[in-house]
Amino acid sequence: MENTDELVSIELPAPASWKKLFYPKRAGTPRKTEIVFVAPTGEEISSRKQLEQYLKAHPGNPVISEFEWTTGETPRRSSRISQKVKATTPTPDKEPLLKKRRSSLTKKDNKEAAEKNEEAAVKENMDVDKDGKTENAEAEKEKEKEGVTEIAEAEKENNEGEKTEAEKVNKEGEKTEAGKEGQTEIAEAEKEKEGEKAEAENKEAEVVRDKKESMEVDTSELEKKAGSGEGAEEPSKVEGLKDTEMKEAQEVVTEADVEKKPAEEKTENKGSVTTEANGEQNVTLGEPNLDADAEADKGKESKEYDEKTTEAEANKENDTQESDEKKTEAAANKENETQESDVKKTEAAVAEEKSNDMKAEDTNRSLEANQVQQQQGAAASVSC
């Protein structure tokens, strides 16, 4: 219970951080509203429009549907209204008969009424005939419509059947075309594979030829060395070298293709025959110092490698020196450019100062001239 301005108010449940006050009416009081909401800021709101404006201006408050403008009590109903609702009027089963009016018509009125009745009967007959004709026409129209719809449906079915048949034919044609295309693609792929196999075989034949040529050159060199040497060459060493070369050739051929085995056997037989012939010749010629020649070749190769490494190191040092010189030159050029720019800036500043001084002198001279003219004018006016 709260007492504000001698008015009794009752606090009712309200949304969070809000207050709902109920002011019961009193006779002779000017207050119209019974319920007043008090906002968290202390503002009193007594109408829905005011509440909407406040909620729009202050977001974060509860929804307007949470604010109830009733006290929460069911209103009392008078006994008179409840009795009226309970009392149900009985519905009459038959309409009450109206009182017949006494007719005080003359004979003429009776004749006119009879004529009117006859005309009405004739009109009714005409209407019946028209209704029958219209019904027949409507039935005929309905039959015609049904026949047209049946014909249209039959045509649609025929068209659909033709479409389905055409689609089937097209699909079958597409399948046959796809099968033909697939067969052509397979044939092309097989041709490509055959061409690749032929190329691989040609490459393998070239490799074998190169190996044969290298072997023949090696054998000729060995024969020359054996002829120029002091003693007779041992046949076992020569045969060992040739056997290693032949094994390398055999490995290359086996990796390339298995079909070339007969050719490899022929080359091996030829190589063995040549080795036997060369062995017999070398036995007669003498044994050369192959180890000494190999060591001499290794020494030459090591010397050449050392010379190349020293040259590369010297070139690297020269490159580093050149890059350092270029960097120093670039730094010197930058310093010279900065000095030149500073000199230009100072010259420009001096020129600006001179121009400003000249402008100031010109303005001073013009002011002095104006003052002199004003003084002369004042003196002339005084003399006048």
UniProtKB/Swiss-Prot annotation:
Note on domains (UniProt): The methyl-CpG-binding domain (MBD) functions both in binding to methylated DNA and in protein interactions.
Keywords: Coiled coil, DNA-binding, Nucleus, Phosphoprotein, Transcription, Transcription regulation
Residue stretches of biased makeup (Polar residues): 80-91, 270-284
Function: Probable transcriptional regulator. Required for nucleolar dominance that consist in the silencing of rRNA genes inherited from one progenitor in genetic hybrids.
Localization in the cell: Nucleus
Coiled-coil residue spans: 100-224, 310-356
Tissue: Expressed in leaves, buds, flowers, stems and siliques.
Chain segments carrying region Disordered: 65-384
Gene Ontology cellular component terms for the protein in this record: cytosol; nucleus
An example Gene Ontology molecular-function term: methyl-CpG binding
Domain MBD, residue spans: 4-74
Protein name (database record): Methyl-CpG-binding domain-containing protein 10
Biased composition (Basic and acidic residues): 106-227, 234-250, 257-269, 295-365
